[in-house]
Amino acid sequence: MRTILLAFICMMALGSSQAQNQKAERMKLIRSTYAEAKKKVEANGKNGQSPKDMQLVINRLEDEDIPLYDTELLDFYFEEKIVDGLVTKQPPYLIVERWGNHGHLRYREVLIDPNNHKVMFCYMRGETDGGFVVESRYYYDAEGQCIEQKHNTENSWTAPETELENAEYYLKLFNLVNYNGYFTPLDLDKPKKATTPKAERLKHIRALYAKAKEKSAANDRAEMSDDLHITIHDLGDDQPPRTTATRIYFDNEGIYFISRTSKSMMMEGYDEFLFEPKTKDLIFSYTRAAEEGQVYEWRYYYDENGDCIETKTTNTDETDDGFYDKRAAKDLQAIFDLLNGHEE
């Protein structure tokens, strides 16, 4: 009996020793991966290399009567690989969040394993307007289980599970932005609505467009704006760097206008999306593309069912009745909804 007990104790000790060794190896890997990620961020866009990063900035006036202004910045750092002959974005290797509201501050880092794209480490630092600081660090194994956590105070604001949820939220945002036009399906089976005569509909769209342009311009001049900026620097080092800048304008009812600019040494592009205030349906889209001295334009006007009722273009050989624009607009709305916590 004593021999069996001794054997059991030895097995338990051996298992504990192996677990400790595995944890030590994992912690060592996390720290080396973190150091490498920081080096990549520091070198991003330097030494003749194309920058590869994405930033989301959302500005919100929380209350018109009380000046509580909310600003959130999300930086995603990624790499690109050639997959089947195409330059393909990889999931980000590091995500950084900066948030501020009326003196309250928050800073986050999420480290992603560059091999299996799973979360390895999360860091959060929060500070109140009174100067109270909370710091938390979470280390995860390959299965996503927290193997160690460190806090500077007993009253932690976060937990291993909530930080993983935040990381998944950030990754979903990254995918929505970078696969814009291919992610959110269109609802093609919804019941048909009654439509207004074409001439009346076009007049309505043009009037709303003029109002949206005026409103977005006023927002740009405002000290406290309500808008979302998305800036992406990408393309591989064998191609000219490209910058895509998207501005989503919104009010208490939701999105009313979006503009998007894309620039590289080879081409320039510009898009606009106009939404119906009551239903938030896309009612007009515009695209302008300039390449090698040639300029192409497309304008699509939509009825109450999202069907294109008028197309104006300088390139009649390439038109799709706004199908891609509708999908792109749907994804941009999904990004906004996800950021505001009311996704479908």
Feature-to-residue mapping (PLM):
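Amphipathic N-proximal alpha-helical interface segments
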Residues: 69-98, 241-260
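Sec-dependent N-terminal signal peptides
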Residues: 3-15
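Short, surface-exposed coil-to-beta transition loops
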Residues: 92, 103-108, 122, 131-136, ...
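Beta-turn initiation residues at beta-strand->coil junctions
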Residues: 96-100, 123-126, 150-152, 259-263, ...
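Short, hydrophobic/aromatic-rich segments at coil-to-beta transitions
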Residues: 55, 88-96, 117-123, 226-231, ...
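Aromatic-rich beta-strand edge motifs centered on tyrosine
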Residues: 109-114, 135-142, 247-250, 272-277, ...
